[in-house]
Amino acid sequence: MGVANDSSPEYQWMSPHRLSDTVILGDCLYFNNIMSQLDLHQNWAPSVRLLNYFKNFNKETLLKIEENDYINSSFFQQKDKRFYPINDDFYHISTGGYGIVFKIDNYVVKFVFEATKLYSPMETTAEFTVPKFLYNNLKGDEKKLIVCAWAMGLNYKLTFLHTLYKRVLHMLLLLIQTMDGQELSLRYSSKVFLKAFNERKDSIKFVKLLSHFYPAVINSNINVINYFNRMFHFFEHEKRTNYEYERGNIIIFPLALYSADKVDTELAIKLGFKSLVQYIKFIFLQMSLLYIKIYELPCCDNFLHADLKPDNILLFDSNEPIIIHLKNKKFVFNERIKSALNDFDFSQVAGIINKKIKNNFKVEHNWYYDFHFFVHTLLKTYPEIEKDIEFSTALEEFIMCTKTDCDKYRLKVSILHPISFLEKFIMRDIFSDWINGRN
């Protein structure tokens, strides 16, 4: 019997470091460093006391605060040029359907609420185990095109996040009502609140008020003002009406430069590309080579990411050429950045079972499912592709679909093209800038 290690499918079932009913996978030092900066047990006084607190303020007292010179620039939205993280805090950068993401220093920390009644903690580890397994088994530079988490904590009590969200929501509600001279109430209409918040969030006067009230009312090193509307949509979504925000996972990643979808023409040129379309070819080619190399591994021809799209591809600095050999060709990337696949939450490979994906798919799929979805999302994100007739025409070979076999860009039928389809595709002159080191 072989010894299970992190390059084997059995790695996900090993018994790692345990803390009571929690489990840590990966580097405990990284994980404990982050956890030491979080207060998972922070509580606040009942909301009625917060309401009574705001009764001490009116338009005139708020105006005096606005006239104050002090401003905490970390309460601007992060896309605002005035934003600056002046504190060593956790800054909210994204909330999607499956996770709430913060950055602190050079780390990214992702909190994922898990449906504990459907899955055991060890059945929710794909986001850590799949990329780690692939990284340890791939032999060439293609392994650099994968984002591996540094650590993952399973089955942690995450109720503090929902409690924090509610506290900030109530603070914003009462602050806006006071600014407008309205009667104070914790009742709200989602549409009315979001409109009022979005109208004010970029105002320097509003940021001055947040600079005063956030430390006084929230008193937390977790700043959720940035992209708060995304967090609002997550917690207020009707499908989570009866959701128990109890337990879940905490995952720690390296901090990327950008996600691939954030690159526009100006940034593409700044990064060294001749055009935005050349940049798109670059990320498409690197992802293609990664998939081809994965499918070369023994027993890995069942690999699925299940969510291959531009915002799940991250960009990192690349300090040396990336060279990937395929048959008699050599692909050389001298760019100062590299793309890397992230977010393996719904992925599967070899013998690593992922019940989440198993429950979602009714028919068999392979790499083509991912690239069909990838091309659809590329064309939606970057309409500029259409200007390159040769490239856009070639990409259409991946999306020969109809409404009966494709729903929201995802295949509903089983189309199992061999990986050789992708191999032949990237040998075309479309990618000549990188073939045999021509760039």
Swiss-Prot record:
It comes from the Viruses. Its EC number is 2.7.11.1. It holds the Pfam family Pox_ser-thr_kin. PROSITE patterns: PROTEIN_KINASE_DOM, PROTEIN_KINASE_ST. The active site is at D307. Induction: Expressed in the late phase of the viral replicative cycle. One of its GO terms (cellular component) is host cell endoplasmic reticulum. ATP binds at I93, S94, T95, G96, G97, Y98, G99, I100, V101, K117. GO terms for molecular function: ATP binding; protein serine/threonine kinase activity. It catalyses: L-seryl-[protein] + ATP = O-phospho-L-seryl-[protein] + ADP + H(+); L-threonyl-[protein] + ATP = O-phospho-L-threonyl-[protein] + ADP + H(+). InterPro entries: Poxvirus_ser/thr_kinase (IPR008790), Prot_kinase_dom (IPR000719), Ser/Thr_kinase_AS (IPR008271). Residues 87-439 form the Protein kinase domain. It is found in: Host endoplasmic reticulum; Host endoplasmic reticulum-Golgi intermediate compartment. Keywords: ATP-binding, Host endoplasmic reticulum, Kinase, Late protein, Nucleotide-binding, Phosphoprotein, Serine/threonine-protein kinase, Transferase. Phosphorylated in vivo. Autophosphorylated in vitro. Belongs to the protein kinase superfamily. Ser/Thr protein kinase family. Essential serine-protein kinase involved in the early stage of virion morphogenesis. This is Serine/threonine-protein kinase 2. It comes from Monkeypox virus. The gene is OPG054.
